[in-house]
Structure formats: C-alpha cells, structure tokens
From Swiss-Prot:
Organism: Bacillus thuringiensis subsp. konkukian (strain 97-27)
Taxonomic superkingdom: Bacteria
InterPro entries: Chorismate_synth, Chorismate_synth_AroC_sf, Chorismate_synthase_CS
Alphabetical UniProt keywords: Amino-acid biosynthesis, Aromatic amino acid biosynthesis, FAD, Flavoprotein, FMN, Lyase, NADP
Pathway assigned in UniProt: Metabolic intermediate biosynthesis; chorismate biosynthesis; chorismate from D-erythrose 4-phosphate and phosphoenolpyruvate: step 7/7
Taxonomic lineage from the root: Bacteria, Bacillati, Bacillota, Bacilli, Bacillales
Binding site for FMN: R132, S133, S134, N253, A254, G298, K313, P314, I315, P316, T317, R339
Protein name in UniProt: Chorismate synthase 1
C-alpha cells in the first residue's frame, strides 16, 4: 500500500489518494470520521479546532460500504478557507489585492520549516512554506491510518496509543489488564493518559505554558497486539519493520526521537537483562518471558506486543516569540505568530497510531498479500498455525 497527501493548512481541502488496499474491506465514512474526531480532541489544542469539524468524503475506491481494490480518494474540507479565499486562492492577485493582503510572512519561526523551506524553494513569502509544513496535513494521514486500522482490525490486530509524558510530568501508573482497557481509560482522559493523577498535573503544565505564551512537548506510546511472528525482514536494511516504524514516527511533525521496547534503557543494562527468553507451549506456540524488545527482533515481529514511543518537541509557534530576522530587511525581529496549540501531544498520540497502523498493514499485505481481504486472512491463519507447530 502507499498514499500521497495534498493540501495546505488554510486551503480549500486536504486530499489523500490511497493505493493497494485489498478488495472486500468493510469501510464507511464513520470509520474514518471517528479517528478524525479523536485527533481533534486533547487538552491544549488551539482555536482552530473550534472552527473545523473534520468530516471525510470518500470520493472513490469504495462502493456500498466495501473497498473495490482500486485507488481510494479521501477529501476533508477546510472550513476556515472561507476566511482565506484571497490569501490562499489559486488565481493570481491584482496589485491592489496584493497590497491589501496582510498575511505575508517574512519573519521565520525558530524550530519551524519556515526559513529552510523558503531558501530551498525560493519563496519570499514564507506562508508558501508554513501552509504545507503545518501539522494540519496530519488530518489526512490520520484518515489513511484509519483505513489501515480497519485492515488490521479485520485481521484481529489492535492498535492503541497513549501519552506517557507532557512537559516533564511523567505517568507513573502505566499498567493495564487488556488493550481494550487501555483504550477505554485513555479515551476518557483529556490528555490521553493512563495515570489520572499525572494527567491532572499535565493539564496544569499545559495551562502554565499557555499563560506564559509558551508551549510544551512530551512522549507518546503506541502498542499493537495480535501481529503474527516473522512480519518484516532481516534480509535487507530497507525492509526491516522496526526501521520503517521509526521512520514513520519521525515523519510526524515536531517529533525528534523514537525508541522501541525499552529503547535507550538497553544501554544501561547487561545483555542478560535485555534479551527476552523464549518459551513454548502447546496452546500458543512460541512466546517470550519478557518484552524488552518491544515485539521486534532482527527487523521482524516476535509475536509479542509491539511497543513504540516517540518524543514530540514543543510546538515552535510561541505567543512570546523568540528572536528572528526579517528576510526582507535583514533586521532583527521577533518571529511571526500563527494561531497554534499550546500542546498537541494528546492529538499526536492519535497520529502516531495512524502511522504505525499504516506501516503494519502495509507489511502484512506485502508478506501475505493478495488482492482480496478474505485470502489475506486465510494466509495469515495458515502462517499462524505453521508458526505454532514449528
């Protein structure tokens, strides 16, 4: 599977075209809208979320609630475009209209794509950069991820994300009895945190940052249960599943770090306290005593839950902006201010779910794939039976 997205933050719409989804997958707009609504929630979001109520339009590739095997086109309207029709319109402006427009950006924000992108593409108005580099684009990445999650769900695989740290406040209680319980607790939390006490402290940290004109980041974790053993590859570097997951997490706006399983903690332990001992029983076949590897060894799944964490830096748009330089005059100025969130970590956990789901669904279809969901399901069932008795 693959997809491409198009659209600017304040343009008329966001679009994604998805190729390679097997035929016979049950899919309706609600499946996608539910994920879009989750992305828009979360304590710390800005005023934009009060304007947009994201709803997807399925333009092609689905008929009567079932995928056809042909490309799927999804569109999400930007309601805020009504206020930006001249500024973001595709048609040329008159000289008078150009003078009247007040939205030209010449003061790049530290931490954003503004300056680097303007130099790369030769834009004197950095709005041409920030409109596309905005995290608004993750709307349609979540839409594509919703399709991938539907593929996984049909194959008995569950994806769940939660927040484990915001602004230096770390969740202490992160245990759960089942992945469904994890999902239930996090959906009820304004910051998508399993630890209620830590969640309240996270909310305070967000409030403090907002009152100071600042922003804060954090850490999200995605857990996946139900993956078969041996998905991915050790044969070539670019087919290693952990490498693909790491790249997917790092592709999310403002993410600066990723770890799998115990991650960097492995540097502090001897090998005897890192590697997961192998067990076997007649009912389940091969399992592990621990899951320090986070469900991945040698670029392949172990059959244990996949555990991936990502670090999100504070959003670079600050209401007390840092020093910058006007690219027209070269004089020092404070950076431009765009409407933004104080903290987008809870929402980012939903985006992280989406990109992880996409990589896993793609890997499964590559390994077991045919053009029909029923045949893929049969292939995985045969593989699981083979692995249990290996």
């Amino acid at each position: 599977m693959r997809y491409i997205t198009a659209g600017e933050s304040h343009g008329p719409q966001l679009t994604t075209i998805i190729e390679g989804v097997p035929a016979g997958l049950p899919l309706v707009a609600y499946d996608i809208n539910e994920e879009l609504a989750r992305r828009q929630k979360g304590y710390g979001r800005g005023r934009r979320m009060q304007i947009e109520t994201d709803q997807v339009q399925i333009v092609s590739g689905v008929r009567h609630g079932e995928t056809l095997g042909s490309p799927i086109a999804l569109v999400v309207e930007n309601r805020d475009f009504a206020h930006w029709t001249k500024i973001m319109g595709a048609e040329p402006l008159t000289e008078q209209e150009e003078k009247e427009i007040k939205r030209k950006v010449t003061k790049p924000r530290p931490g954003h794509a503004d300056l680097n992108g303007a130099i790369k593409y030769g834009h004197r108005d950095m709005r041409n950069v920030l409109e596309r580099s905005s995290a608004r684009e993750t709307t349609v990445r979540v839409a594509a991820g919703a399709v991938a999650k539907k593929v996984l769900a049909e194959l008995g695989i569950t994806v769940a994300g939660h927040v484990i740290e915001i602004g230096g406040v770390e969740a202490k209680e992160t245990t759960y009895r089942s992945i469904e319980e994890l999902k239930s607790i996090t959906e009820a939390s304004p910051v998508r945190c399993l630890d209620e006490e830590a969640g309240n402290q996270m909310i305070k940290a967000i409030d403090d940052a907002k009152s100071n004109g600042d922003s804060i980041g954090g850490i999200v974790e995605v857990i996946v249960e139900g993956m078969p053993i041996g998905v991915g590859s050790y044969v070539h570097y670019d087919r290693k599943l952990d490498a693909k997951l790491a790249a997917a997490i790092m592709s999310i706006n403002a993410f600066k770090g990723v770890e799998i399983g115990i991650g960097f903690e492995a540097a502090h332990r001897p090998g005897s306290e890192v590697h997961d001992e192998i067990l076997w029983n007649e009912e389940h076949g091969y399992t592990r005593r621990t899951n320090n590897a986070g469900g991945l060894e040698g670029g392949m799944t172990t059959g244990m839950p996949i555990v991936v964490r990502g670090v999100m830096k504070p959003i670079p748009t600050l209401y007390k902006p840092l020093q910058s330089v006007d690219i027209d005059t070269k004089e020092p100025f404070t950076a431009s201010i765009e409407r933004s969130d104080s903290c987008a970590v809870p929402a980012a956990s939903v985006v992280a779910e989406a990109v992880v789901a996409w990589e896993l669904a793609t890997a499964l279809i590559e390994q077991f794939g045919l053009d029909r969901m029923d045949l893929i399901r049969e292939n995985i069932e045969k593989h699981n039976e083979y692995a249990r008795g290996f």
